[in-house]
Amino acid sequence: MLRTCTVTIAAMTLGAALVLGTEGRAGEPIQVGGKMTCKTPEQHSIPVEGDPGHVLVVQIETCVGSASGESGRFDGAQQRWFEVDDLVKGSGMIHGYELAKYKDGSTGITSYAGAQVTTMINGKPEWTALGTFEQTKGTGSMANIQVRGTWTAKPTSETEFVMDWVGTMTEGTK
């Protein structure tokens, strides 16, 4: 009887610890999404010698996010992107990092990668891009969450573009 009582008490103690300690456990993924309006204030193109039409591009982009509903925490985010593109005749791979500053003072660093495709439309090159992203670090309310998903982008002018993004946000995963 003593052994059964000890095992029961131990199991109850462990069960209580698990219930009381759920703060660090991952929550259910929430669908999130929004739009970013972006500008490219700085861009440097380096031609790849001996390979006509091949350039490496290093650029900084600034964006303002808009979102609502479950995605409301992303609304008004101020972002700076640091990007490297490897393009042949305007098409190729892109990769970068984005630093977001949110209204509540939190920050997030996100890694992204994708592909850009450039086609001629009415005699002018026009690009579209798509890819994936994942938040790698965060502070404040963004410190203990995971955000990942997909994005698509298209230009609105020579130095501006819009990006739509969708994904999942899971709290308590880091």
Which residues does each PLM region occupy?
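Beta-strand-enriched cores of mature, soluble protein domains
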Residues: G24-K174
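Bacterial N-terminal signal peptides
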Residues: T8-V19
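Positively charged n-region of N-terminal signal peptides that target proteins for export
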Residues: M1-V7
